[in-house]
A protein has these predicted regions:
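RNase H-like polynucleotidyl transferase catalytic core
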Residues: 46-52, 144-148, 162-181, 197-200
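Active-site beta-loop-alpha junctions of metal-dependent nucleic acid enzymes
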Residues: 97, 116-137
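Conserved, non-catalytic sequence blocks in retroelement Pol enzymes and Pol-derived host proteins
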Residues: 9-10, 25, 72-73, 91, ...
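An active-site-proximal beta-strand-loop segment
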Residues: 70, 74-113, 119
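Basic, flexible linker segments flanking DNA-binding modules
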Residues: 1-76, 175, 229-238
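Mobile genetic element proteins and their domesticated derivatives, centered on retroelements
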Residues: 1, 16, 33, 37, ...
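C-terminal domain-tail junction helix/linker
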Residues: 162-166, 188-241
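Acidic/histidine-rich, metal-coordinating catalytic segments
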Residues: 139-154, 172, 228-231
Length: 241
């Protein structure tokens, strides 16, 4: 338990219990794990609230209906995708620099389908994320949900989705919860690896993001997936198909 906590101080007793079962084949009930954590003074790191919500584009070229309508359950991979962009900061001396992460999340297995990291929050950031997802999942035609950020309301982006055979869906104005699984992933990433740290180079920040997404997809178990990782959930579906 101390090893799990030392490797990931963000984990509370419930996630420690899940890791014991998943990674070490040790079955123990939550109350016992909680008692041991208290005796060893094991506490999860402070949880920060994620307040991110993209502002609507000033002059949207295309707005889709909220076709997802908070129906976040999916029966198979590539049935429903969500996407968003989030911002990070790093410091070089007294200068503050920004970095932007665009990602696509699958609502069936909660895996990160694709992501792109760039210095600017612009159309290519989002367009390239979609292109990477299509390349990694040929033939996929998911319902594609986003907020009303300027990239997603761009006519070129709409045409890219249409060419790929994807139906577009958008959150209602100012309704962050319409995109809550994606917003939730940002919160998880930032709570577990970003908040409370000061990054002093671009490379350090990029390495953190890339390594975390690999960890999230391949090693981080989730209770809503049946104490499986996103990749395990994805592979189980493929084996059963």
């Amino acid at each position: 338990m101390e090893q799990i906590h030392n490797e990931s101080p963000d984990k509370g007793y419930r996630r420690i219990k899940d890791d014991l079962a998943h990674d070490h084949q040790i079955k123990v009930n939550e109350k016992r794990v909680l008692r041991i954590c208290r005796s060893l003074d094991i506490k999860s790191t402070i949880k920060y609230r994620n307040n991110g919500c993209t502002r609507q584009a000033a002059n949207p070229q295309h707005i889709a209906r909220n076709n997802l309508n908070r129906h976040f359950h999916a029966d198979m991979p590539n049935e429903k995708w969500e996407t968003d962009v989030t911002e990070f900061k790093y410091y070089v001396g007294t200068e503050v620099h920004k970095l932007y992460l665009s990602a696509i999340l699958d609502l069936y297995d909660r895996r990160i389908v694709s992501y792109v990291i760039r210095d600017h929050n612009d159309n290519p950031l989002v367009f390239d994320t979609l292109d990477a997802a299509i390349a990694a999942n040929p033939g996929a035609r998911p319902l594609f949900h986003s907020d009303r950020g300027f990239q997603y309301t761009n006519r070129v982006f709409y045409n890219k989705l249409k060419a790929a055979g994807m139906k577009q869906s958008m959150s209602r104005r100012g309704k962050c919860l319409d995109n809550s699984p994606m917003e939730g992933f940002w919160g998880i990433l930032k709570r577990e690896r970003y908040y409370g740290r000061r990054f002093t180079s671009r490379d350090e920040l990029v390495q953190m993001i890339e390594s975390y997404i690999t960890y999230y997809n391949e090693r981080r178990v989730q209770r809503n997936l049946g104490v499986l990782t996103p990749l395990e959930k994805h592979q189980l579906f493929k084996l059963a198909a």
